[in-house]
From Swiss-Prot:
Main localisation: membrane
SUBUNIT field: Interacts with ATP1B1.
GO biological process, one term: regulation of sodium ion transport
Superkingdom, natural source: Eukaryota
Subcellular location: Cell membrane
Membrane spanning stretches: 35-55, 62-82, 151-171
UniProt topology in membrane: Multi-pass membrane protein
Identification of the protein by name: Sodium/potassium-transporting ATPase subunit beta-1-interacting protein 4
Family: Belongs to the NKAIN family.
Taxonomic lineage: Eukaryota, Metazoa, Chordata, Craniata, Vertebrata
Record keywords: Cell membrane, Membrane, Transmembrane, Transmembrane helix
């Protein structure tokens, strides 16, 4: 019962996490945020592996997903610090775009209710560096929107880490119990096949 509930919870969580990651990937593509795009791509692949491992009882896949959940929390903490300019980080820097674009964030450039101003790019040969659109006077700061997205990702990743640890523990116990009763052990089969041959040899050498 515990195995089923833990697996079902992790399957539902992975499915929701996959939807949230795809939504975030779309907006990062629209904002040309190349570092988050790469991170989201890796995240989506590992979430799919975790989902597959949970359904198919693949312990290693679930372990990889669980370890990645901790890494994903760290990455999203960095994103929060970046957009809130904590620890000397600047949200106007080109750290997330690899200096390939002057765009900063789709939410910053297209957030409803903001006043936008197009700034021409100077000395940039990148195809996506034609203009930088900055927002001002927003009801909700776009940086907070990015931070809230990361907070949601952290919450899901923490739940995934807990559920992943539980599923790994259950899978490990099931493997240990299976090995204890002789699973994948050819030794008992050898003894079963050995007894008829020994009995047959005894019958052959019995005196008439």
């Amino acid at each position: 019962m515990g195995s089923c509930s833990g697996r079902c919870a992790l399957v539902v969580l992975c499915a929701f996490q996959l939807v949230a990651a795809l939504e975030r990937q779309v907006f990062d593509f629209l904002g040309y945020q190349w570092a988050p795009i790469l991170a989201n791509f890796v995240h989506i692949i590992i979430v799919i592996l975790g989902l597959f491992g949970t359904i198919q009882y693949r312990l290693r896949y679930v372990m990889v997903y669980t370890l990645w959940a901790a890494v994903w929390v760290t990455w999203n903490v960095f994103i929060i610090c970046f957009y809130l300019e904590v620890g000397g980080l600047l949200k106007d820097s080109e750290l997330l775009t690899f200096s390939l674009s002057r765009h900063r964030s789709w939410w910053r450039e297209r957030w409803p209710g903001c006043l936008h101003e197009e700034v021409p790019a100077v000395g940039l040969g990148a195809p996506h560096g034609q203009a930088l659109v900055s927002g001002a006077g927003c009801a909700l700061e776009p940086s907070y929107v990015e931070a809230l997205h990361s907070c949601l990702q952290i919450l899901i990743a923490l739940l995934g880490f807990v559920c992943g640890c539980q599923v790994v523990s259950v899978f490990t116990e099931e493997e240990d119990s299976f090995d204890f009763i002789g699973g994948f052990d050819p030794f008992p089969l050898y003894h079963v096949n050995e007894k008829p041959s020994s009995l047959l040899s005894k019958q052959v050498y019995l005196p008439a």
